[in-house]
Amino acid sequence: MRKACAWLLALALCGAGSATAALRLKLDAPGLDPAQREASQRLLDEAADKLPPAFRERLDREIAVEWRDDLPANGMGQARGPERIALNRRYLADLTDGSAASRQTGRVHGTERRELLATLLHELTHVYDRARLWSPEEKREIRRCTRQEETLGRIAQPGDCRGQAGRRFTLSDDPRLLDLAGWPQRAGQRGRREAHNGFVLRSPDVYELSNPREFVAVNMEYFLLDPSYACRRPALYRYYQQRFGWAPQHSACAQSFAYLNAGRDFGQQPLGQLDPERVYEVDYLLAEANDNLVSRWGHTMLRLVICAPGRPRGPDCRLDLDQHLVLSYRAFVGDLQLSSWDGLTGAYPSRLFVLPLSQVIEEYTKVELRSLASIPLKLDREEVASLVERAAQSHWSYDGQYYFISNNCAVETLKLLRSGIPRRPLQSLDSITPYGVLEMLENRKLADPSVLDDPKEALRLGYRFDSFRDRYQAMFDVLKRRLHIPQDKVEDWLALPARERQPWFARADLRASAALLLLEQASLRRQLLLAQDELKRLYLGHLDNPAGDQRLEVAGKTFQQILDDSGFLSRPAELLEGGYGLPQAAEWKHLEEQTRERQARLRRLSDDLDREVRALLDPERRAELEANEANIKEIGAHLRELHKAAGGLMLP
């Protein structure tokens, strides 16, 4: 009986101990007067109250907090081991007399007292992170993956173990956290992470970019203290909420995200609102390869299939092409001539452009003569919303480095998919080419290529957009049959000088004239592209000395202004001075004013350049453009005469 009672007493005592087990903050206060002690204790109590309950329960230890005068002048505090935190004594007087509560620091937290509170929470997070307070499930997975890596090596390690073997921290080496924070997997490195964080824009504190440990601690400050954190960094807010099973109250968040449309129509307002609820599906948009330096592996993009306002989400949204947007990682080169060496060494910034689908279709199918394939990704509603949200975050915050080989459009898009969609099969994808990424998505049943099985149906439903090359060749075949033109390929015909094509016009019947008009328009687009390249080379050749070529004295300045002013379309963060993360409603008005003003200036500059640019071209190029335009005018008039003679309707 005594043994049974003793056992019950021990069990009761053990249960009582576990019920009260929690973090204890103890003020180590030698030499403090009562007022200093009281102010310090209030700070400690407030910090403890701000922490998530699970945080306090798991970090079951006593941590001493002391004031010291040997900390760096620019530092407010520092964790000194697992059971001690030091605060900078220079702030003690302000905390004691209450002036710290009103003294502004110029940082997001505002006052000196809030900064002290944030510092204490920051350092406590470091202690928590180093304590390896994993859940039982995490512990089992880490042990399993560590054993497998020790036995099989990194190369043979299963995909679901990437980043799990040998983990040392509670949060800061969690693969999911690293994806969200901006330290993604390196392409082809079996889970190794990038050394640098490219999310450098609109950061609340650049210290977070030092390493993942500081990122976790800095963001814990804002998670606990900033009610707008859930709206500014929603994915990270949800991450902390899931880790602790708790979250502080937050502001009401807008349902849509601001973005800047980088379309080339300077007459349109670029600022738009992207509502994830209107996104029906997301497609992997692939531009086929060609022989150009930067296009020989194809180009990877994502297409947002957005429903027209008022239309319920469904297959009919695929017909709302004017609403669809394209997410495209591109090397931002200031619109100058591409350098293969700079592309290999990462000299170009890599940014996420948001473009209208119509422009992308024209750019690839009509100008570059490349087909587009649009393959739906198999995502549920939550994943679609998460991916759109992550794209918006990247649009405002990411400014990476573009490498043609190791960090190109395919790699950047894969990083976006991994961070935006928390699905295990994505973590083991490894490819540096657009076709390679697509093949892996298909193999893992994440993409549906069956939509391309029927070519005609794919064209009708917008899963494929054919290159105009085949259409041009078909038009040229009409000329071959009716006019017996000696060239065999449309490319050979378009390569002829415009004046050599002109004599054939008078012999053309109605159908041949229509074909000639289409081909002359294609030739003009080609000439404009060549003229653009010529201007790039001219500008680049005199970049350091614009006065070295008299042609650049006037138009060159306009050209430079356009390059300078259009940069905001790929780096929208430069329009906002304050805040961090996703822009909030209070910042939208400023964005509207800034974008409207810059877009109007770009339109004026573009009109000026249109008038001045011909003077910059070589005489031969200028003559070819003028001859091409004259051809279009002549064949158009000839076509109208034939139409009239055939009894066709003539509009006034």
Stretches found by the model and what they are:
Residues 187-197, 272-279, 294-295, 299, ...:
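Active-site-adjacent bridging/hinge elements
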Residues 114-132, 217:
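Active-site recognition of the HExxH zinc-binding catalytic motif
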Residues 80-119, 278-369, 403, 611-621:
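Glycine-rich catalytic cores of cysteine/serine-nucleophile enzymes that process amide/ester linkages
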Residues 29-38, 103-115, 202-207, 287-291, ...:
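Second-shell loop/turn segments in exported
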